[in-house]
Each structure stands twice: as C-alpha cells, then as structure tokens.
Amino acid sequence: NQVDGIAAISRRDAIDFEKLGSKKPKLIIPFGINLDVYTPVINENPQLNFFHLGSMDWTPNIEGLNWFLDEIWPEINRKFPKSHFYLAGRDMPEDFYKRKSPNVHIVGEVEDAKNFINSNSIMIVPLLSGGGIRVKIIEGMALGKAIISTAVGAEGLHYKNKKNIWIANKVDDFIKAINYFNEDLQNINKMGLSARALAESDYNE
C-alpha cells in the first residue's frame, strides 16, 4: 500500500494483484515490440520440426518442458517418427542434456534468437504455470511462426484458437494440432502468416 497505483502487462496479472488484496487503481499496459526488426522467413517447403526457446533458469519453463518431454513428446514421436524437437535457451539444466528422448536436440544458448526461430517451423510453449506476457510467443508471431501452446502459455494474449495459435492442454490436443499441420504442410505457413497479422494489428509498438 505504499504506491498510488499498479501498472500490469496483462489482465491476469491485474486480477492476481486484486486477489492479493490490493485496492489500488490498476492500469493494463499491453506489451508491444518493434516489428520492423522482425522479418519472417517463409519456408516454401515446411517440415514437421518443433522448437522451444526460453530462459531455462525459469522454473515454469523447466516444469513445462519436463511435462512435454515425459508425457507429450513420446506420443508425437510415435505417430510422427520423422519429426524433431529443438530445445534452446540460456542456462540449460544438465538434466536436459542427459535425456535420451528420441529426435530431441538440446541446443542450449543460441547466438541469434531470430535466426534460430526462423530456421524452425512450429513453436511449442508447454507452460503449466507462471504469469506475465509470453514475449517469446509474440516474437514467434512476429516472425510468422505456427505456435502450439497450452492455455496457460497463451494467457494475457489476444488470439483466435486454431487461427493464429493452436491451444493444446493434453496429448490428444497436441496430436490434433500436428495432424492438422501434417495433412497439408502449408497449414504451417497459413497459421504463421495469420500469427504475423495478429502481431501487426495488436502488438506493434
């Protein structure tokens, strides 16, 4: 109660402050990025390769990726054995390097995040907890990426499910999403272009 007001970057965060008992005025300030520095590279022949990029010293990322690799990836790999998953981020825990998950590549820290994102097809955001705005999702949208995310991962974002992002909370949801992309690989680009359009309309500084 030592402040005159609270600025939150999402409605969820504003509600969380209220749950903590704050009666102060709240202002939601949407997050934005300069799209001029995000140039999508559209692959004319997209493939079923997946990626995650995020700080690996953040507990929700570790929790979500362990869940994804333990519960979701084995089924994806069984149904789509030619697919690959590339996991990148700074401060990668040693446990991830020790994993023996098939077709999972632990990249670690990358020099150029935009180049890494542009070199892959489908962003995976398997968050189960955590607040704030998922900056990496907005960056992925800005670079024209198809994105599969849990509902928690997409909290605070404006989106239309299955148009500019695909929400998946359990293994069947992920399989349905990947089936959609696999039926026509151009659907990867279709959703990515829709995501870019959303970034331009809602998240451009």
Predicted segment positions?
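Conserved acidic donor-binding segment of nucleotide-sugar-dependent glycosyltransferases
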Residues: I165-D172, Y180-L185
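Short acidic/histidine- and often glycine-rich active-site loop of Leloir-type glycosyltransferases
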Residues: A151-K162, W166-I167
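Conserved catalytic-core segment of nucleotide-activated headgroup transferases in glycan assembly
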Residues: I28-S119
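Donor nucleotide-sugar binding/catalytic pocket of nucleotide-sugar-dependent glycosyltransferases
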Residues: N1-P40
